[in-house]
Amino acid sequence: MRHGGGDNERVYVAALILLAVLLGWPIPRLLPRVTVLRAAPAAAILLWQSVSLAAIAAGLLAAPLAVLVQARASSGQHDPEPGQHLPLLVAGLAVTAFVAGRLLLKAHLVGTDLRRGRREHTELVDLIGVDDPTLGEHVKVLTHPTQTAYCVPGSRKRVVLTKGTLDALDADQVAAVLAHERAHLRQRHDLVLEFFTVLHTAVPTWIRSTAGMGEVKLLIELLADRWAATVVGRRPLATAMLALASGSHPTSALGAGDDAVVRIEQLAVGDRHRNRVIVAAVLASVAVLQLPILLMVATLVS
């Protein structure tokens, strides 16, 4: 038995557990404060995904590796005999299977609920909405005075505008709203949001980060804004957002007026700091994804 190796193994496992805790609780609460990331929303979303995946990996690996280290230490040898400490190993794998199973179950439930909600809302919109050939395909207009615009993703995708929106906006502003919503649909931002919604609902309530979830939603809107700004310009998009800021939309949809003030500020900033933010976010994403893998390998070979 190598006592030094055993001590190192415990350190690596402890570091893995600490990593899972840090990535799962304080970091999702602190990362929204790094507002400079909003200059590059795609890279920022990549960083958020990397943090989430690394937290999951660290959490799934911690239990079986901790059991393996304990089995090695109690057996008095670096590699236990096959079958020795089997109950401990089964217990460790059971914890991992429970966590993974909970994630998969939540993924199924969230996905099913979202798809059902979108399907039902699309059917309702098709029933009460009217077509306007001047607005393009998949657009429905609701005869309502409120100023609202949103999209419903899915196989039967729709962009929904109200009569109040069309009355309040000029042609360039309407084009900006349509470009924003079509960016959501074309780039499948709903799948990104679904990924984070699954993780948010899969963990216990006291771990969930409302600020983190809100920041991800904002980044998705900023991503659509960047696309729309390249199509119609920043000014029509900004003024349209102000007009729609008080509008509402279904929870299963993506709306154009959310977080209007912050989004307009980002439009004003433009591409300032964008390249540096992209480089920093990508490097941070790669680094954080490697941490649980490196700690696992270090535990196994020490």
Each language-model region and where it sits:
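Hydrophobic transmembrane alpha-helical segments in integral membrane proteins
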Residues: 8-23
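Alpha-helical transmembrane segments of integral membrane proteins
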Residues: 11, 15, 48-55, 88-96
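Juxtamembrane boundary at the C-terminal end of a transmembrane helix
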Residues: 12, 291-302
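Alpha-helical transmembrane segments
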Residues: 23-31, 102-103, 291-296
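Polar-ligand-bearing catalytic/cofactor-coordination segments
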Residues: 27, 31-44, 92, 104-193, ...
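Membrane-interface segments at loop-to-transmembrane junctions
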Residues: 38-51, 80-84
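Select subsegments of transmembrane alpha-helices in polytopic membrane proteins
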Residues: 49-60, 279-286
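Transmembrane alpha-helices and immediately adjacent membrane-cytoplasm interface residues
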Residues: 58-72, 77-119
